[in-house]
């Protein structure tokens, strides 16, 4: 979208806002989530809701359904309704730029959660250290499978900062431990795609020793493919620490998961939004803790 078209669209949005019957109250915070069809982002939303309730805000949540066009429409809708501040968990770090710019031109402060925006102005970004998490996952694989292990990496949605950063951290471990990377292929943070991609990769690489999946949903899909193929000796490490992921670790099925704290990301987003609305200074970036979860 060029700037002329964007300016026209924002002008139309601003005009509509004056007649909108659904204009937002001053005590409302808007949250646009990439998808609510993923336990991680449901937890993020729940954390935001809990903090909003605590601070006395009404939280309006819109689901982008992993679709950048839907994401832009959601932000347009919120702009029409006169939102005072926008929390957004991008579907794609590049594609979200138009939505961020739309909010910028309407003078709506933007805070990104979990995934960054590569374009537009953002007042604060709240996320885990995904690079460190990817490195921790790789280091754990080396500890259990050994130096030079034969590994497969299941990547998230191309273009998201989470996928890029987790991959970057894992590549640091690949270099440090001289892994033999048999394949690196996207499965879009999706369990069914993780299953299907892993089935295909197993045909070509039956000698795989370990799998790093950039989220727990893909890890659980890969685990199912390995179980079906009778490959119980292949270790799988996930990322996120979702309830399903941690249960699989405690049941001895997943070797480990890098646990994020999505509820804290959501809560910190609302807390930061509260500060912005009150005119207080906020940091450009707030890191949220993560941890390696293994069976005890």
Swiss-Prot record:
UniProt KW keywords: Chemotaxis, Periplasm, Signal, Sugar transport, Transport
Signal peptide: 1-25
Presence of the UniProt keyword DNA-binding in the record: no
The UniProt record lists the keyword Signal: yes
Localization, UniProt: Periplasm
Organism lineage: Bacteria, Pseudomonadati, Pseudomonadota, Gammaproteobacteria, Enterobacterales
One GO MF term: monosaccharide binding
Alphabetized Pfam families for the sequence: Peripla_BP_4
Biological processes annotated in GO: D-ribose transmembrane transport; positive chemotaxis; transmembrane transport
InterPro entries xref list: Peripla_BP_I, SBP_2_dom
Species of origin: Escherichia coli (strain K12)
Name of the protein described by the UniProt record: Ribose import binding protein RbsB
A GO term from the CC aspect: ATP-binding cassette (ABC) transporter complex, substrate-binding subunit-containing
Subunit structure: The complex is composed of an ATP-binding protein (RbsA), two transmembrane proteins (RbsC) and a solute-binding protein (RbsB).
Function: Part of the ABC transporter complex RbsABC involved in ribose import. Binds ribose. Also serves as the primary chemoreceptor for chemotaxis.
CDD domains: PBP1_ribose_binding
Predominant cellular place of this UniProt entry's protein: periplasm
Family to which the UniProt record says this protein belongs: Belongs to the bacterial solute-binding protein 2 family.
